[in-house]
């Protein structure tokens, strides 16, 4: 990714198979969220101190990625039109979990749980039965569990996005690592934590969890219901902790 970020404008950059797949997943989620999920926010992330001290002078503009770069599916390459800075941290961990899961299944390992930075794949069963995954209470300093999900002996991908583990104070103001590209700064909503379940892709769950963490609750409700996404959102309303569960989440047998 660093090579891509440093690469010249208007020159074709050839992607590895893995990087191509990651970017294609990300762009699909970007399309479905009207650009709220944006992998070109790298300069904003860096300027807020959540990334390296690179590309700090790059000016971010919220606009369609088609105005920033193009991807050639035949050659698996990218050509940048502008000095965009890619940040794939919101999908790369999920992709790594998927890759390990695929490897295990290909080698006939059918009972496993994989966890990379909170992005999880579970399949089959543990020695004690189904896998039970605890989702942290976003307001608990002791990492207490807010709720649990199980895989019911099937494959599930679980991704959780929140700001309770990655934030800082700048000039006395709480700053989140979750960037809303529409306002070019940390998100401004009442969402504390988002958990997405996907029955085939941790990568996709990872990206959508990030998007729902950035969007307003109303936006997330509308989008998750229209796409049939299994999502549970913890949020604050009138000073109280509340939960939203999409219809797809309510209808599953994993909780």
Task: Describe the residue ranges of each PLM region.
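Mature catalytic core of soluble alpha/beta enzymes
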Residues: 1-255
């Amino acid at each position: 990714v660093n090579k891509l970020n440093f690469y010249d404008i208007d020159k074709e950059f050839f992607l590895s198979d893995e990087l191509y797949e990651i970017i294609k997943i990300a762009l699909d989620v970007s399309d479905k969220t009207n650009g709220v999920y944006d992998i070109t926010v790298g300069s904003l992330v860096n300027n807020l101190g959540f990334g390296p001290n690179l590309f700090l002078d790059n000016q971010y503009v919220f606009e369609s990625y088609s105005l920033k770069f193009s991807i050639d599916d035949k050659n698996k390459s990218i050509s940048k039109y502008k000095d965009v800075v890619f940040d794939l941290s919101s999908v790369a961990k999920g992709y790594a979990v998927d890759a390990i899961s695929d490897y295990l299944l290909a080698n006939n390992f059918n009972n496993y749980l994989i966890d990379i930075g909170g992005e999880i794949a579970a399949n089959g069963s543990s020695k004690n039965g189904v896998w039970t995954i605890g989702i942290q209470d976003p307001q608990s300093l002791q990492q207490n569990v807010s709720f649990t999900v199980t895989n019911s002996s099937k494959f599930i991908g679980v991704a959780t996005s929140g700001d309770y583990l990655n934030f800082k104070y700048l000039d006395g103001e709480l700053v989140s690592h979750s960037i809303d590209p529409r306002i070019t700064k940390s998100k401004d909503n009442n969402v504390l934590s988002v958990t997405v379940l996907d029955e085939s892709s941790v990568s996709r769950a990872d990206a959508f969890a990030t998007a729902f963490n950035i969007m307003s609750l109303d936006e997330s409700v509308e989008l998750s219901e229209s796409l049939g996404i299994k999502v549970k959102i913890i949020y604050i309303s009138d000073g109280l902790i509340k939960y939203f569960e999409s219809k797809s989440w309510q209808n599953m047998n994993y909780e």
